[in-house]
């Protein structure tokens, strides 16, 4: 499914980099590709307008079904929600609502 929201291209890349930097400062050691995967899967499934808790649960289950794992931190709902919370901050700075993203 083609992504048609406002958060795409260079802005999506900038968001991913910014979120990665914020998580690094919080002590998370994870690759930027993992953040990109969260953003891409969130939009692929069309769930970005749901609550952060619901998105995190859906993505945790989706990644489990796909056999996707992360180390040293588990790719669980708590980590996914942390990514989504920083994404929300970025969206706020960019003046984009989650529904428009």
Show the residue positions of the predicted features:
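Hydrophobic membrane-targeting and insertion signals
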Residues: 1-23, 99-100
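Short amphipathic alpha-helical segments
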Residues: 11, 15, 51, 55, ...
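Eukaryotic scaffold/interaction segments
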Residues: 4-7, 28, 32, 47-48, ...
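Short alpha-helix boundary/capping elements
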Residues: 43-47, 63, 67, 88, ...
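Amphipathic alpha-helical interaction modules
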Residues: 17-62
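Amphipathic alpha-helical binding modules
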Residues: 69-101
